[in-house]
Structure formats: C-alpha cells, structure tokens
C-alpha cells in the first residue's frame, strides 16, 4: 500500500477527520512514562510496530506513528475483518433475517444437489461464528485468494471431521460463509450492509473490502481501513455497542460476542477473549484492537510482527 511522510499539517488534518477527542494521558489517569517505556521496549526488541493509538474514558491519550506510516492512510487489517463481520451478523440477527441456530446449508440449496452429509447438515450460524465448524483443516485467506472458482462451492467440499459445535479450529472459511449468508438474505455485500449501519455512524471513511469470485466480501480478511477505524471498533465494544449516545449494535450483542465459547480456546463470536475480561480483534502481523472494559480503554496497533504474544 502506498505510504508517505506525514507533515504536521497532515497529522492535524487526520486527527480532525477521525472525530476522536484528545487529552493528556495524566488527565485520564494514564501514566505517560509507562507509554514511553512500552514503545522503548518494542523498539529495543526489534518489533516493527507501525502505529499505536490508546483511548481511555472518551479520549485518545496517546498515539505514535513509525515512518513512513500515516494516520490518514488505510492499510490491510487482515483478520480484524472477522470482528467487523461479527457486527454485521449481530445486526442481521436483530433485524430478524436469520437465527443463530439456522443451518448453514439452508441458505445454499443451489450448491447442494443431492444428499448432504449429516454433520454438514447440522452446522449452524453460531458454529460459524465460534469457528467450531468441524472442518478437518483450516482454510486461510491466502488459500481462498488462490481460487478462481466459487468459494461457496469450495466451502461445501471441505471434509467434516468433527461434529459442528464441538471443536474449535480457526478458519477463514467460516467467515466467508457468514458473509455469503448475509448477502443471500439481504441482496447486498457485507460491506454495503455495514456502510450505513456501522461505518458511516462511526465516521469511518475511505475503507475498502476485497470481493471474491462470487461477488462476496471475504468476511475473514481483505478489509483496508485506518488505525483510527480499528480503534473505533474496540471503543464501540467497550461502550456496549453505543456510539455518541446512539446504539449501533443490538443490546446484549457485545456481551455475547466477546464471551468465550468452548474450551480450551477462549474464542467468542469472531473475537479473541481473555480470562481477565479483555478481548481482541486480531489480524496477521499484529493488526489489533484490544479492549479493556475494566479500565474503559482500548489499544489499537498495526505492524509487521509475528504474533501478539510478543507485545503483551
């Protein structure tokens, strides 16, 4: 993605455009020295952090940008897209377009001529959200992008090795089928569905989402947006789906989406969860928004780091 050096005027313009308020760390009870120490440790460890924004109690209290990355330039967020997809599913459920226990196969009769495997027939929307689809192996975004045939058709060819709803296996195939289901019931792409319901109310502009061979957004990846947009996703969930006094996500949805489903992996509805109550949207190379409801805080970072464990 094309990048350039940001001038002070460009930085000021980007801050004004994102609609987020700023305050000194101390005003929000945040230790500025600890932030500097964190950034110093990242640098000393040789970790390539591209940007960082920290928000607490209504204010951005710290932000950092590594040359040549800029706050006004969208970047590929990789699997963070999954958490945006979860928002769309929550909205569609509230709209009565489908239910969590609806079977995935029921939306694609044209792809399933003949008998359907029993376990495949049992797979639900909730199984897709929690990545418990029973697939024998994971399917990454890179695998999807190499296919020029229908990704929906390919999904139904993946062998089912476990009963859906029982075993976690991280797979972008689940996210793609959620996007495909949404398109089937709305006649819109996932991106178009979210635009007036989420992106515009959050002040997210200039975002782009890839389209697969079926004319469907991948759901699990392919979304480009700014670091501030990533931060807003986390803030929205810290605030229980409310933005500037208006409810954007259905009441109760955030609690369901960020609660762990199953063991040993504590995964929600396309959100990674932790025992302390925090939760994260995470993309490859640490594109990440981690929300800490107990502190009223969200941290958004982007970078080229292999594994979030290197940061926390």
Model-assigned labels for residue ranges:
Residues 76, 95-133, 157, 186-225:
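Active-site helix/loop module of the DD-peptidase/beta-lactamase fold
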Residues 44-53, 66-110, 117-123, 163-170:
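Short active-site loop at a secondary-structure junction
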Residues 39-69, 289-290, 296-300:
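A short, well-structured edge-of-sheet supersecondary motif
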Residues 206, 251-299:
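Active-site Gly/Thr loop motif
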Residues 58, 75-101, 128, 178-182, ...:
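Active-site SXXK
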Residues 1-29:
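Extracytoplasmic/periplasmic proteins that interact with beta-lactams or build/remodel peptidoglycan
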